[in-house]
Amino acid sequence: MNGPRTLDVVQRWFQAVVTHPDGVEGGVDSEEAQRLIRLKRNELEAVVRRSRNLTAAERLSIYANAYYTRLLECLGTYYPVLKSTLGEEVFEGFAFEYLQRYPSQSYTLDRLGESFARFLEETRPGREEGVEPDRVDWPDFLIDLANLEWNVARVFDGPGVEFQPLLTPEALRSFPAERFAEARLAPVPCLRLLSFQFPVNSYYTAARRAGEGEEVPLPGPAPERVALTRRDFVVRRYALTVAQHALLEKVLAGATVGEALAAAAGASDLDDDALAAELRAWFRLWAAEGFFQAIT
């Protein structure tokens, strides 16, 4: 396309050049850039003027380097524990490849890391010959950790209830017992449930508390279930048992309290009396921690 160079054409050409993974030279030669403005590398000054000290290519390289530097920094803020676990160089290698497959689609960058866990799943190494196909290993740990960190970020940035009334333990306790089984709990919008193959929530806590240069032992595979919510603009993480997870999963799906209790009973090996005592303690805790907005 070598017609009049409108501002729109030049802007799209500039984007194609400075965002190319092979740098400015690769960007100039790319199909998209050539479609917009056909020129050779030594003809760059027909579009971008040189300065007193820098050539056109050098000026473009400043933008190209800054573009990826900013995106890598942004991904690092979403995945700080994953970055420290892998090391900066390895993390940025993964992140750079990710940006080629899932380029930024928003000027705000607030969803830049949305598909990072999916990318790790898509690019995970094949399992070694002779290893059971359902065995979990190191890549699965990284995928779990990425999923946890992204959900923490989304809960932090997402809707919350900081200035809204919540269901208090007192209000829950005073709800008519005869209506309890058929009632429905309204969870707060920031409540999320997660299930992992590795204890990444425990690892995340240890890694965030570790001092600079302190190594945190990597855990072996062990199922872990977690609830995330936000209170007073701080993301809270709660380890869950299988029965707790089953109960809250039903609540989030809009089931009645009775249906949620049945799910918890089916997932628990406690006898009826012991489970009833546990359920009372769970509901007191969850109401105190702001899991629910109302019961109707």
Question: Which residues are covered by each model-predicted region?
Answer:
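Long, charge-rich, low-complexity alpha-helical segments
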Residues: 1-176, 233, 238-296
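Low-complexity, glycine/alanine/valine/leucine- and proline-rich hydrophobic stretches
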Residues: 183-253
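Short aromatic-glycine motifs in intrinsically disordered, low-complexity regions
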Residues: 178-180
